[in-house]
Amino acid sequence: MYLSVTRMHSVVLLLCCSLFAAAPAIADEAELKSQIDTLRSQLNLLAEQQKSLAAQAAKAESDTSIGGYGEISYNNYRNDSSRNQADLKRFVLFVGHRFNDQLSFNSELEWEHAVASAEDKGETEVEQMYLNYQFANEMNLKTGLFLMPFGFLNQSHEPPVFYGVERNEVETRIIPSTWREGGIGLSGSSEKGMAWEAGIVTGFDSAKLDDASSPLAGSHQELQLARAHDLAFYGALNYRGTPGLTVGGALFSGNSTQGNADYRADTGKPDFSGINGRITLWELHTRWQKNDLDLQALYAKGKVSDADKMDNVLLNFNNTSTTARPYLPSEFYGWLLQAAYTVWRQGDMSVTPFMRIETFNTQSVMPAGFGADPANADHVSTLGLSFKPHPQVVYKADLQRYRDNPDNDRFNLGLGYMF
């Protein structure tokens, strides 16, 4: 702690009074002058210490950063108004700290659907928490819970960053955004515009698959008491050497039965002993941004080895259990094309209409004897508009049409922010 300015003035006054009180007893004028010089030196030293401590406190404060984002949505269904809903979809806070020029900490805390309780559907979760060590100018080591480098949305999903009130179907159903795993990862870049990431992380747990409409959503473990018998590896590569252009892809692969850990812990669950159930997911993407034009394309595909063996286990399980489990697909895929153009700008404000078409099928190939649900495949068209009164604040509106499942047709409104 350092002395406040008021306290320092009090010290000065006290010392001066003491000096003047003692003056009659000081016979030698030279001695008096020496004491005054000593006092002046001490005061100067005290002032310098105060400045130094204040500077250190200011630096320490700037090393810690806080940010966040949030979004609210309204969905109005064309054929069934009873499904209409308004939702405080997400409230997120970022907290980061830089320990020194090489070592930093990053975290992301998220609240979904406003209220989290036993009776409500809201969730509270740690979306990211990791340490990053920069041991070379263009190379980093990441350890902890972090986002997988897949597609456009998974690492950059703040509302002002993407088009549309809802996140696109392909990067929700095929790529399970927001997808994070615990582990260790390396990343680097070159002066020619190449950027790469690779690492070893926790994998999927196929015993937790609970939704055939999004095969990987329930089975990625989020580092919540994650089974770690079967780890996975990932890699991503992106080229950004041409201004405005991004071309890249990513791969993730690992066994998913986790040594049959779920059955070993509870024999009331499916028994996948002797089955590996490797899940492999890959994607390719490209983006071109030039002046007011923004074009995007993405293709993603997943494969589950041993899906036939696992589904036969699930068939026997479902025949004897009161709780039916969905069957795993051998393959699933999705693709999207998107175009946006900013038609008006004034100061910080802008208006950008966009159009997106996408196709997905979460059960494109099923093992022999197991049928696919038509509700899990569709062609979706989205036409919408984003108005930004500030680059970090957005109001959105769009129309969505589902060709094969028209009951999902809807009109959406939304707002979002980031800081």
Per-range role (PLM):
Residues K208, S214-N260:
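Loop-centered beta-sheet repeat module
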Residues A57-S206, H229-T246, P329, L336-T342, ...:
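Outer membrane beta-barrel
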Residues A25-Y77, F419:
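N-terminal periplasmic/intermembrane-space "pro-region" immediately following the signal or transit peptide
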Residues M1-M8:
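N-terminal secretory signal peptides that target proteins for export/translocation
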Residues T178, E222-H229, G274-R278, H285:
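Short, contiguous, pocket-lining structural segments
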Residues R78-S81, S117-A118, M129-Q134, N154, ...:
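Outer-membrane beta-barrel pore domains
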Residues Q49, E197-G199, A207-A212, N260-A261:
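A short secondary-structure junction signal
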